[in-house]
Amino acid sequence: MTMASDGERLTGLWFDGQKYYPEAGLPACEAQALPLFDQTRAWLDRYFAGENPGPVPPLRLEGSPFRLAVWRLLQQIPRGEVVTYKAIARQLERKRGGGRVSAQAVGGAVGHNPVSIVVPCHRVVGCDGSLTGYAGGVERKAALLRLEGVECRAGAVPEKIV
C-alpha cells in the first residue's frame, strides 16, 4: 500500500495497482519518515489482525462537496456492517432536504475515495448485496469484509444483511 500525507494528516492510502491511483502530484509519501505514517501502519496492523483498530489517523480529504458528503457518510458505517449505494443516496437526499441523488453518483464518489480502508468504502454494496465497484478489486473487497466478519460468497453478501 502507498500512503500520502500533507505532513500532518493522511491524504491518501491506496493498494498497489488500485484504480484511480494518482500517478503524479502526491504530497509527502511513505519514503519520508513521518510519525503519521507510523500511526497509520499501526492502525492497519490492528485492522488486518482482525482487531478494532481504534480511532482513525487524522485525515484531510479533498474533493467536491458531494464527494466529501459521501465520504463523511462512509466513515459512519460500523465495522462488520454493509450499506447499499442506494441507502447512502437516500441519506444524502434527507440531509439536503430533498432533490434526487442517484446510487450511481454515490458509486462514483465511493470509487474515488482516496483513503482506502480508513474511509471504509469497501462496506458499500449493491442493492442486491453484490460486491460491485471497489477500486481495489472485488476480491479484495470480499477479503476486507470477511476480515470484519461479514459473510461473503459468490461475489455478494446475503440480502438479509443488506
Map each language-model feature to its residues.
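Nucleic acid-binding interface residues in structured DNA/RNA-binding domains
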Residues: 1, 51-162
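Compact structured core domains
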Residues: 4-56
